[in-house]
Amino acid sequence: MASSSSSERWIDGLQFSSLLWPPPRDPQQHKDQVVAYVEYFGQFTSEQFPDDIAELVRHQYPSTEKRLLDDVLAMFVLHHPEHGHAVILPIISCLIDGSLVYSKEAHPFASFISLVCPSSENDYSEQWALACGEILRILTHYNRPIYKTEQQNGDTERNCLSKATTSGSPTSEPKAGSPTQHERKPLRPLSPWISDILLAAPLGIRSDYFRWCSGVMGKYAAGELKPPTIASRGSGKHPQLMPSTPRWAVANGAGVILSVCDDEVARYETATLTAVAVPALLLPPPTTSLDEHLVAGLPALEPYARLFHRYYAIATPSATQRLLLGLLEAPPSWAPDALDAAVQLVELLRAAEDYASGVRLPRNWMHLHFLRAIGIAMSMRAGVAADAAAALLFRILSQPALLFPPLSQVEGVEIQHAPIGGYSSNYRKQIEVPAAEATIEATAQGIASMLCAHGPEVEWRICTIWEAAYGLIPLNSSAVDLPEIIVATPLQPPILSWNLYIPLLKVLEYLPRGSPSEACLMKIFVATVETILSRTFPPESSRELTRKARSSFTTRSATKNLAMSELRAMVHALFLESCAGVELASRLLFVVLTVCVSHEAQSSGSKRPRSEYASTTENIEANQPVSNNQTANRKSRNVKGQGPVAAFDSYVLAAVCALACEVQLYPMISGGGNFSNSAVAGTITKPVKINGSSKEYGAGIDSAISHTRRILAILEALFSLKPSSVGTPWSYSSSEIVAAAMVAAHISELFRRSKALTHALSGLMRCKWDKEIHKRASSLYNLIDVHSKVVASIVDKAEPLEAYLKNTPVQKDSVTCLNWKQENTCASTTCFDTAVTSASRTEMNPRGNHKYARHSDEGSGRPSEKGIKDFLLDASDLANFLTADRLAGFYCGTQKLLRSVLAEKPELSFSVVSLLWHKLIAAPEIQPTAESTSAQQGWRQVVDALCNVVSATPAKAAAAVVLQAERELQPWIAKDDEEGQKMWKINQRIVKVLVELMRNHDRPESLVILASASDLLLRATDGMLVDGEACTLPQLELLEATARAIQPVLAWGPSGLAVVDGLSNLLKCRLPATIRCLSHPSAHVRALSTSVLRDIMNQSSIPIKVTPKLPTTEKNGMNSPSYRFFNAASIDWKADIQNCLNWEAHSLLSTTMPTQFLDTAARELGCTISLSQ
């Protein structure tokens, strides 16, 4: 190892030395030789040293076998990092010119990779950290893109380049629209070497490298590449890179980071470096007071879009949650506007769906990585994370395209946006791609999960933020809890439109009924409809409208038609498209029609219901000559044919008629003639060739049948008289019910006035080859006939409860003499002079406040007509009269008196129910006294009063009771607190009212309405075994009354079959729960459940009488012989009860519970429990 002479270079003596031999196998000998050669190299570090090392590398590489020189070069960089560029640059030159091909196991690359991953902890040192930093710094500096086309390069060079980097992913340098993108392929030949070094290095080296390379950390100075300084900034355990770095690293760093991470994915199919790079880019690094000035802050995010896309495609929700919260909680020195950065990150991920190839984001990435983290942060209630998450949610909701992408950004599908008139096809085009539908479904499910998974307080706060983001609540409102930065810098709310709301329909499908979240989305829907109507029918004065009509009639008509298309598209989608289920679409169409009526009333300056106007017009026209009638009709059409209600009606008319025509044509085209149900139904699946396109015809007829079933189901649901539980612009009182009745009355009036609709519906009733269409059309036909007068009378006569509260004094004394004569019932005439003292309507009057005295009719004259007008001036008087204490009971004439009063003022029946219902809820529990029974006192007396009102006006009063019960009835959930006990008491009283109404068989109208409320009856009998007999007994009483109501209903003949259907379905659903009550500890419950089962079994022996001559259409449209005897008659109740008894016995035995009560009940019912099944 002696020094060479002046005439001989020092590298010439190495040609025959052990440096070029394979390394010794003995570890210690190998280490000693390496150290010796490193010290020898250090003796010649002069100006000529870089050239000598370059010549040595060019002559000795490539090499197929491992030699000691490999380790010596790597170790020399470790001991002399300031001369590292002299060793590494020749190797880089060989890689670039293709003379040396990179491989992880090739020489000398393997030695440099092993250098950054020491075999022992003792090898970690300050010197080692400087060497690693120098190697990565030099490789990064020279890892610049090389553009070469296949036409300019030879086969050898192309082969070398393809082996030098196997990453096929494009970098950020070429533009997306560059014409030379396919010809010029940028290659970074040093990326594989850098990625292998980073994969072998500790985590600290990787994070510091990405921060340094992206410009986050380091001191950037202009000038040449300078050697590292001796000073160190970190400890040996946590090495950090060099602070002296040229300015070019900021511009070149993004391309290097992308290339290095892409190379790992391409060669190893792993993303370890990506998982380290993204947090290093987004989160502030740990710093001290000595080096915090070296932190440059959050880098620009756009160059790393592809990296973020890959990271969020593979990261776990917990990791992305830490990342998002860390970014939001970052100090201002790191991210002056962390909210903008987080929103930009979402924008980049959403936009990446257009161009990203390979790994794709999961369908629910928005929920997994953002919405879930936002919900968890907001559940913290206080702190920086909660406020920042709320502000981020506000930003995201203010830009709806971030939640649900526009049509052109769904899975890269190119869909051209139509102008204003292209609304009808947008949703259809979108769902043609299954991936797009899956993305929308997953995102909607994620939004619903965020709303409902963190408690009611968080749900309420999210709802208020959503409404504020959409401009429904002012930001300075006390109801909105937003950070000050959002209130100080408000954003422009999005323009409400049907396209904007379409994805929210999926969210509504996942939200629980009656939740605050559903109320929020329904409120947004109401605002959307109102916005669409304001665009379609802008409020204008008649003078301005006339002036515009004269000046630019053609232009205004074209604009109006374009604006009208959005309204029609919304109605069309809800009626026929699959964007929402039938139940949800029915509720939304209820809102659409009510908002249309409200908008039309406000525009015309009149708030009179549409049905009242129509009925008034009809009455006037009926008494006028034909010419005047035609003139009135023409004027009416001119006035009403331009509003939103007319647009709604025109769509219903066109859709029903078109579908009816198409469906009725099918049997003719299929073969004609009269078909049986099975024959024609079987031909639906057979392709019919028309003009050579059998597939298109088959799809068309299937679509027509599906659309017909859907629109009939929705129209039938609009007759249910159920108000929309949330989102309507009406008040909490009876106006909701008036609105529901108004919708049903409007649909009924539309069908009755239109001969085309009536004819189309009759044609659909004849489509017996499709049972559902036939059944629904027949049911709709009967509903129009049965309910039209009932709902119209409610709309025309009923007034809101607030009107009576405003017009009636708090306390009023009135003494009136009534002279009432019974008609056709009593021979004698009885006169009642009644003194009535009315007190406050908000409380139950104490005993003694009302005095009712009977007098003879002497001297009374004829005050009956005047008495009816003066007595009981409002609903409060009538409600107090009905609930007054009477020791002698409810005298026989009161029922007739009540009918007379309600006949004179029919609007009272509806409002009296509202007042009595409030009394029912607020009345205290009163124990029986010696003078009177409990049935005549307290809330039970209110139940009696409600039944009397229903008996007097069964149709309207029963509908009002059902709707009030649907609104007030709460889930049967066991709660020990005071609020839970109050809820139980209210439910018990409601069920008691339903029981008494079900027992009243004298009024078929009320029984029909109650039986049709199947959802209410199921809710009233739900949770029979949740608590003790306090709730179980009223529910069993309702089932008993239901079972006993079947026999009198069957006596009505065919018209009662549909009612029996609803009652039997309730009994069928609650049969298992009734069987379980047979083992209840309470003897009263066991006896009552046995009575219920006995009444159910008796129904099997009741013959169903059917008149020989049937009407054209029957209830629910089932006039075929098979339906005439109804499903209830075909139910083998005894067999069903027997099976339930067996199952209950097995269940009790499996839980080691006694079965003696069950055996006793089975013997009483005549059943035998078999345990062999």
Swiss-Prot record:
InterPro entries: GIGANTEA (IPR026211)
Location within or outside the cell: Nucleus; Cytoplasm
Tissue: Widely expressed with highest levels in inflorescence apices, young flowers and young siliques.
Alphabetical UniProt keywords: Biological rhythms, Cytoplasm, Developmental protein, Differentiation, Flowering, Nucleus, Phytochrome signaling pathway
Main location: nucleus
GO biological process: cell differentiation; circadian rhythm; flower development; positive regulation of long-day photoperiodism, flowering; red, far-red light phototransduction; regulation of circadian rhythm; regulation of DNA-templated transcription; response to blue light
Residue ranges with Polar residues bias: 162-172, 613-633
Compositionally biased residues, Basic and acidic residues: 854-863
GO terms under cellular component: cytoplasm; nucleoplasm; nucleus
Region spans: Disordered: 150-187, 604-641, 840-863
Induction cue: Expressed with a circadian rhythm with the highest level 10 hours into the light and the lowest level at dawn. The peak of expression in long days is slightly lower, shifted later and the decrease is slower.
Superkingdom per UniProt: Eukaryota
Assembly behavior: Interacts with SPY. Interacts with ADO1 (via N-terminus) and ADO2. Interacts with ADO3 (via N-terminus). Interacts (via N-terminus) with CDF1. Interacts (via N-terminus) with TCP4.
Entry's family note: Belongs to the GIGANTEA family.
Role: Involved in regulation of circadian rhythm and photoperiodic flowering. May play a role in maintenance of circadian amplitude and period length. Is involved in phytochrome B signaling. Stabilizes ADO3 and the circadian photoreceptor ADO1/ZTL. Regulates 'CONSTANS' (CO) in the long-day flowering pathway by modulating the ADO3-dependent protein stability of CDF1 and CDF2, but is not essential to activate CO transcription. Regulates, via the microRNA miR172, a CO-independent pathway that promotes photoperiodic flowering by inducing 'FLOWERING LOCUS T'.
Protein name per UniProt: Protein GIGANTEA
Species name: Arabidopsis thaliana
